[in-house]
Amino acid sequence: MKIAIVGGPTAVGKTDIMIEVCEEIGAEIISMDSRQIYRYMDIGTAKPTPEQRKRVLHHMIDIIDPDEYYNAFMYRKDSLRAMEDVLRRGKIPVYVGGTGLYADALVRGIFEGVPADENIRKELRELERREPGILRKMLEELDPEAATRIHPNDLKRTIRALEVYMKTGRRISELQKEAKGDDRFFIIVLTRERYELYERINKRVDKMIEMGLVDEVKRLLGMGYSKDLNSMKTIGYKEVIDYLEGKYDFDKMVHLIKRNTRHFARRQIIWFKRYKEAVWYNLTFEDVGEVKEKLKKLIVENFSV
């Protein structure tokens, strides 16, 4: 038995395609999106609509509040529990989403062996406060491989990598390779040519604005959720907050959301290219109807192995 993980960049069309595919083969979707886990954040995370979620049962959406902590280790544990529940009911589970870190947690396993040390974390945060950028330089020197996988602005993961090194004397990138993988999964990636994908991203952002993204952010702030939360630094939310604080005008806000989403999509594609064994479908050149038929066949046949 092999379970499909269907990944790809944001706005490529994963949700619409996979809802139709899963509906026809009697499958349920396990979301693999690190932002759709948050309640109240619907428009900016492009969650499936209530109607779509009625057509196909979705798991791992709306599971925590925006101020709750969550990581890839927790996702792996919770989503595997959801997967087992789907299997018990005689259905086919299909993972769908663009969070490469979650795909890694499922396929390659995840290292979570060193307990957090608040003293070390406090020390590192203070060091960064005194000399911005110093932790990134330290990571590049101590663990170059981890530095290539951790975004320069991701202070939380940078601190975690340095914390592990300081506690164990070993690089987190080495320890992660020792994590136990899971051979029950296979990966499918949906993609499009850059020009088409970027056009779809721009249209999606325009639609989010029309649907009330600014009001959604205002509502979240009104509920008491801090702009400094990890959830509120999601692309779309961060730019709206800066706009509301008067850092730039409305048009600049829209421009930045589009630009940052395009950059994010490019990073997603690069991430999934690391899976040499993945099956890729380019929706710019392949007929979408034919791709759906191929997906149905591939998912069902692998599940039946």
Curated annotation (Swiss-Prot):
Residues 33-36 are annotated as: Interaction with substrate tRNA. Substrate binds at residues 10-15. Gene3D superfamilies: 1.10.20.140, P-loop containing nucleotide triphosphate hydrolases. The record marks 99, 121 as: Interaction with substrate tRNA. Pfam families: IPPT (PF01715). One of its GO terms (biological process) is tRNA modification. Keywords: ATP-binding, Magnesium, Nucleotide-binding, Transferase, tRNA processing. Its EC number is 2.5.1.75. It catalyses: adenosine(37) in tRNA + dimethylallyl diphosphate = N(6)-dimethylallyladenosine(37) in tRNA + diphosphate. The keyword Phosphoprotein does not apply. Signal peptide: none annotated. GO terms for molecular function: ATP binding; tRNA dimethylallyltransferase activity. InterPro entries: Dimethylallyltransferase, IPT, P-loop_NTPase. Its cofactor is Mg(2+). It comes from the Bacteria. Catalyzes the transfer of a dimethylallyl group onto the adenine at position 37 in tRNAs that read codons beginning with uridine, leading to the formation of N6-(dimethylallyl)adenosine (i(6)A). Belongs to the IPP transferase family. PANTHER family: TRNA DIMETHYLALLYLTRANSFERASE. NCBIfam families: miaA. Monomer. This is tRNA dimethylallyltransferase. It comes from Thermotoga maritima (strain ATCC 43589 / DSM 3109 / JCM 10099 / NBRC 100826 / MSB8). The gene is miaA.
